[in-house]
Amino acid sequence: MTTPPPPSTTPLTYRDAGVDIDAGNALVERIKPLVKRTFRPEVMSGLGGFGALFNLAGKYKEPVLVSGTDGVGTKLKLAQQLNRHNTIGIDLVAMCVNDVLVQGAEPLFFLDYFATGKLDIDTATAVISGIALGCEQSGCALIGGETAEMPDMYPPGEYDLAGFCVAAVEKSQLLDGSQVREDDVLIGIASSGPHSNGYSLIRRIYERAGSPADLDIHGTRLIDTLMAPTALYVKPILKLLHTHSDAIHAMAHITGGGLTENIIRVIPPNLGLRIDANAWTQPPVFQWLQREGALADTEMWRTFNCGIGFVLVATPNQVAPLGQALDNQGLAHWQIGRVVTPVDNERVHIG
């Protein structure tokens, strides 16, 4: 029987095992001023507690809480390859707050999860600065989060992100699609680019094309277009709901599944959609992706937002005032289709 070797007399520390508590504490101190700028009057606690506190009293009569969680997909991989960490946090916030906005809810607070094999304070600070900026631009408080340093779990230089958002809406103003009627009009609001969806396919096309980062796409470098942060629709849409609530029957955030699979999620099961693909011109980056990837139209519609990041389902006689209100806020928009009775069980027709 083999005798086990005697235990080493060299003392070990958590840092020896790959976890640097001091680095984590230094990160917290670095991000505190960024986080504080996002706070709303309802925030009752600072960073560092076991739980973050938010006082909802007095703001709503019958509040309904709406929660959401998301990541940024493999756009994160591209950000890490390019060493661009300061805007991916905006994407993270947008993916969450735009989702809860669909039900007419105001984002209240946000929490993030940042996991890595070895904590790089500068990289983490850059990421969280983007998260804080996204929260500021959405009126949403960044009240907590988790930074997990997990040796051997991630390759050097890589990290993962997740976001969590809680929003609220008056029960009487909740948008759940139940008011949608045949002939309601679809108003598509412009995206800022691919947002945070379809990046596994985007990266494959980009690499197959020779990674042409500096390729001119309508006056912008291709890589800058691909890395443009996801548009934040919260403030303009909440303003629109305040002034035109009766005109909007439902809303949709165009994420994974594209135009084919997202708008239909808020449409009653007995109704369908007819979308006019000629109602707007797809931005050049989507034209490049389709050409370089030899993608069928159907693949484009169910993978990318194709230039439409958010959709309003509106009563027909209110389309003009809604359009004027969107113009006043500088949001490009188009009438892209209607709610219809399905033909031959085809609930979504794009043509």
From Swiss-Prot:
Membrane-spanning residues where? none
One Gene Ontology term, aspect cellular component: cytosol
Q: Kindly state which keywords UniProt assigns to this record, in alphabetical order.
A: ATP-binding, Cytoplasm, Ligase, Nucleotide-binding, Purine biosynthesis
Catalytic activity line of the entry: 2-formamido-N(1)-(5-O-phospho-beta-D-ribosyl)acetamidine + ATP = 5-amino-1-(5-phospho-beta-D-ribosyl)imidazole + ADP + phosphate + H(+)
Write out the GO MF terms: ATP binding; phosphoribosylamine-glycine ligase activity; phosphoribosylformylglycinamidine cyclo-ligase activity
Q: Where in the cell is it found?
A: Cytoplasm
| InterPro entries linked | PurM-like_C_dom (IPR010918), PurM-like_C_sf (IPR036676), PurM-like_N (IPR016188), PurM-like_N_sf (IPR036921), PurM_cligase (IPR004733)
Q: What is its EC number?
A: 6.3.3.1
BP terms from Gene Ontology: 'de novo' IMP biosynthetic process; adenine biosynthetic process
> What top-tier enzyme class does this entry carry?
ligase
Please give the pathway this protein is involved in: Purine metabolism; IMP biosynthesis via de novo pathway; 5-amino-1-(5-phospho-D-ribosyl)imidazole from N(2)-formyl-N(1)-(5-phospho-D-ribosyl)glycinamide: step 2/2
Q: Which Pfam families does the record match to this protein?
A: AIRS, AIRS_C
User: Which coarse location class describes where this protein primarily resides?
Assistant: cytoplasm
HAMAP family this protein is in?
AIRS (MF_00741)
Tell me the NCBIfam families matching this sequence.
purM
Q: Which family does it belong to?
A: Belongs to the AIR synthase family.
User: What's this protein's name?
Assistant: Phosphoribosylformylglycinamidine cyclo-ligase
Q: Which gene encodes it?
A: purM
